Amino acid sequence: MGDEFPFHHLGYVCLNEIYKHLTLKEIFQLSFSSNQIKRSLGIASIPVKSIFVNFDSQYPKIKLIGESSQLEWVFGIPDGLEYTDVGVYKIGHFKFQCKTSGTAFYTEHYDLENAMLVVIRYMISIFKCSNSIITYLSIDLGVIEDSRAICENFVAFKKVERLSIFQTNYGVERNTLNFAQSFDWICDNLEIKNIHIGADVLEPKMVQKTNGEFDIKLCARRFEQVLTMDHIYLQHADWITSEDLLNLDVQTAMLIENNLTEQDLNAFIKQWLRSDSDKLWWLEVKGKMMFNREEVLKDLDVQDDAYRSLNTRWYVARRSRANPSGNGCARKKMGSLRPKLTELWPFKVYIIFGSILIVFGPAALNRMITLRRMDVETDRPSGSETGIFVSKSAVYPFGNKNEVVKVWWNIDKPENCLDWIGLFDNNDSSFYLDQKSLRQHISPVVFTLTSKNLLNASEVYFGLIDGMTGRLLAKSENVEICKSASLVVHEVKKPENINVYLNTNHGRIEIPKKRSFSRKNGSFRSSFEFDFDVEDLHISLVENSEKLNFDHFIASNQLQNNYIQSKSFSHSHVVEIVFSIEPKTSKKSAPDIMEIASSSQTPPESHWKTYLDAKKRKFYVNHVTKETRWTKPDTLNNNHIEPETPVHKRLSDRSASPRNSFITPRRTITVRSAGCPKSDLIQFFQRDEFKTALYENQDAMQIYNECSVVRHAIHRIQKDLDPPSKFENQPLFVRFVNLFADITQPLPSGWECITMNNRTVFLNHANKETSFYDPRIRRFETKTSRRGRSVPSRSSTAHKGKIDHALISKCEDLRKIAQDNFPQIAERISKKLMLIERFGGLAVASLANDLDITLALSMLDSNTEKLAGEGDNIKMFYEDMKKEKLGKGPSRLCWKVSRDRLLDDAFRIILNVDPFVLKKSRLHIRFEGELALDYGGLSREFFILLSRELFHPKNGYFEYEGNDYHLQLRPRGCETEKEKKWLILCGRVLALAVIHRCYIDVFFTNVFYKSLQKRPVTLMDFKESDAEFYKSMNWLLENDVVDLEMSFVYSSMVNGKLAEQELVPGGESQMVTEANKAEFIDLMCQKKAIRGVEKPLEILLTSFNQILNDNLLNSLESSDLKRILSGSLELDLNDWRTNTIYKGGYSDCHIVVEWFWEVIETMTNQERFDLLLFVTGSSSVPFEGFSALRGNEEISKFCIEKWGDATSFPRAHTCFNRLQLPSYNTKQQLKSKLQQAIVNGMSYSIE
């Protein structure tokens, strides 16, 4: 029964695992007052595994069980009572049992009830501390004076899985009403699933009001509470009626001392046994009455011999108050005999002597008729086999029934949680019938095939699909869907005096039929078949006297099982039928074994050989034509021979199917591609030029985007999984293909175009072929190289190793490009890019042949080429600087500066050095009070910190333009020497930052960068910095300006007054027209760029060019100069992590490293730049990304090194871009230490 209900007074509170960390001595000392302890225990160091408390017996006891010993206290034992167990000693009024030696403890006088209360309350206090639940509680409140007080102590539990609560008075009436009130409190305050209770608490006499009347409503409420529990045990249930029994909504019920009549009990048994209810699976009723078991047995068709067999094997003693232990002994025997009883008594009723009735749920049934199906499923494939395998080669989904197929797979491919197995119609693979994800399943996957999910498919297969690309990785053998089948009987085992009949819609068929068959020991071996479609089956057993003994009904879906048994209550008739269900291939019955033996002597035609399969059926094999068939070759017309499917080595029990033949009675499309030669049409889809042709053909592109069938067909043709002819029955795909045909050209020679049933058909009279594909489909010319060996493209070679990383890191840019250029497929591209972001290189490899991703790659290539061009400009610029030996001379400039007076020190040091020395010398920086060597890190930080102060708008020399906080020179006069020196210092700092490849922490407008290069500005340079000016000039470009009467004059507000300045000599009289408005706008832009800043810009450029010749900047665009000076604003976390190296025991999967990157993700962008400044000495990132981070003279990637202990702060080596990170204990500790280091760690020292 598994979880059996306790039908006797166990009387223990089982508190497992509560006292794990306490010894027996500690528990005893805590349970009683110190003045009650007379001696200490000798077993003081034994941990407790469980504790049992029994208060519902005449002699209450407490038992504690340890690992190797147990201790038992028995309260109030008479002196004359002795224990017989080994190791039990009696000392006064207290006894204990111990398997090991120990010192005895005793007490002479104590209050029994108070002692028990002390123990209970202490246990409750333990429960409160441990937040546990009571797994089982059994307590007799009859021995407790104040039972309500005891119960209220249990409020700490909140949940009691099993509760046994009684009032055993032992002949003395005491506190009955208090017990009832205690029960009310328990039901209202505790969650109880199983209850074992004296039922008299539910009687009206137990709920008397103060005036002596009965409270019927309270009684009913208590009874409803009991009925909602899973298991109940009702004692004193003499008021229970048969109607109450039928209303029981429980799993287990036990009724003791009831007054049910024989009629009530029999009626309940009959009604319940005939219902389908599975709620009540155990009922035990005890009482003085005797019910008519013969009547029940007769009504249930129970045989006398079975009942007698039962009685002789199960002894149960009558329960009586004089011998309460007798019933317990009987139950022990019952428990040991229950497995045997299940075999002897198959039905769900146990009747044992008159006073006990036990009802079980459905059990294993003894068989009267057994049907065993042969060869239903194949075994699991061996581990060495690769592919996808199925357990059945044919299924029989009769009516609304279903059949289960197991699918195994073994593929030499890395596991991907997106892969799935689909069920496909073999005749139309454009969509799946059912699918299961491999993320939630392990091999095998179980598919349930029904008529609903199979639709009209006659043959299906299972395919393993790549979740990234939709590519078919493996395909199973075909599974036949048999909607018409034959039931083949192979063997019948039965007594000789019994005839077996099958009752179907074809009539009554005897098994075996009246013909010659072998017969041995009552076993009839035969092999014959009859039509069996969707009907249910009746099997009748008839004795020779034609008296019907048994008629068993078998539903059609049961025949799909491997093993079927009928219900039986007798061992006298046992019949076993071995059968199989086969596809209905012919009206001719399969020959039996005797016929096979005789027919095998007939020589078949030449080249044909005869074989027997696993079921002893004959089939024929032609090794020349590689054909197999079930019928003799000489019985068919040679003009209509249809080759049949070869018998597979693993699925040899299925018949061949004629639909595998390529020759059919009617005219069909041939396997060859009829539009153009097969290879040409396949190559059309497989060539790379097809992608270009697709995106150039807007109509075809629309069909491709909207129809998944078309995309699926293209994929299968490209992978040589299916020929193009397979999809000719898809009009939309045919239309898609024909959109690539050049209809301006005539049809090829021998071709004709006709219309049939509103569809265009192309006829090839030369080859006598028909096709729906236009033969004028575009063909791509194959380009041949004149050279024997070709040199790979420099661009593709350079980017081959970086394309995966570039695609992963630039997914967001690709989404924007796709949205701008291809909005109709942007959403689909975005979904695939999400897969790439999630699964990285695995997704890139899987989607390499996807058309959408191919387009994304082409967009990335164009973008990459653009970036490569820009990178080439910067690389050329640095090569030119290297030739000029700028910043690489033999001399060295060692500058010692203070962080507190950085700007003053820069004025004092930089302006006092000759410009020629500045541009030729190497640079080394030292911060005052800090011991450090400059290998690049200190110089980078020097320029970052200096630029923040030097170019700050608060000084009045620069101001913010636009909304992006880019700086531009502020209009002002430069009359004082200080102003001139400030601008000279600005020019020199900018030039030195470029020479020493150090970034500054400011960004300028495009106008300023072009001014440094002495290049004219354009209108686009003002788009971000001065949006109003840009919109005004752009409006003039797009509209007619004749009516505006504008002249070549620049107007501006100076000191609150309108000031005008001619753009050209005589500009006030020269009007703006459509012909010269472009010139006007260009002049306006040039004037706007230098208006008010002529003098400051001249001073800054002079000092800048003294160090960096403007000729060197000719190879750069303004965007290049911006990247050289300020780096990139983009901070790609994926690029950062990808280009990080680890030392000292760290790796990318180390837990501390994982915490570090998780902390980085939670930081703001400003905090991340501060971290970069702390580690690298620069708060900017090279425009090439983190892969281009530089150390002293070469590339030096970001590095995380394990160093120090958990109490240390992180530290950095800015010259080598190295962060020394201790191995912290928690992520929170790492985050706190890192933040403190960034904020307070801007100083250097030498180890």
Curated annotation (Swiss-Prot):
Record-annotated disulphide pairs: none
CDD domains xref list: HECTc, WW
Tissue: Expressed in the nervous system throughout the body. In the anterior ganglion, expression is limited to the two lateral outer labial neurons OLLL and OLLR.
Keyword line: Cytoplasm, Repeat, Transferase, Ubl conjugation pathway
Protein name, entry field: E3 ubiquitin-protein ligase hecw-1
Pfam families assigned: FBA_2, HECT, WW
Organism expressing this protein natively: Caenorhabditis elegans
Cited InterPro entries: E3_ubiq-protein_ligase, F-box-assoc_dom_typ2, HECT_dom, Hect_E3_ubiquitin_ligase, WW_dom, WW_dom_sf
Location of the active site: C1215
GO biological process per UniProt: protein ubiquitination; regulation of defense response to bacterium; regulation of dendrite morphogenesis; ubiquitin-dependent protein catabolic process
Record-level GO cellular component terms: cytoplasm
Stretches assigned to the HECT domain: 914-1247
PANTHER family: HECT DOMAIN UBIQUITIN-PROTEIN LIGASE, HECT-TYPE E3 UBIQUITIN TRANSFERASE
EC number: 2.3.2.26
Gene Ontology MF, one: ubiquitin protein ligase activity
Location of this chain's protein in the cell: Cytoplasm
Pathway of action: Protein modification; protein ubiquitination
Domain WW residues, every copy: 602-635, 745-777
Catalytic reaction(s) noted: S-ubiquitinyl-[E2 ubiquitin-conjugating enzyme]-L-cysteine + [acceptor protein]-L-lysine = [E2 ubiquitin-conjugating enzyme]-L-cysteine + N(6)-ubiquitinyl-[acceptor protein]-L-lysine
Role played: E3 ubiquitin-protein ligase. Functions in the OLL neurons in the anterior ganglion to inhibit avoidance to microbial pathogens such as P.aeruginosa although worms do display avoidance behavior, vacating a P.aeruginosa lawn within 24 hours. Likely to act by inhibiting the neuropeptide receptor npr-1.
Residue ranges, annotated region (Disordered): 633-659
Enzyme class, broadest EC rank: transferase
Residue ranges, compositional bias (Basic and acidic residues): 641-653
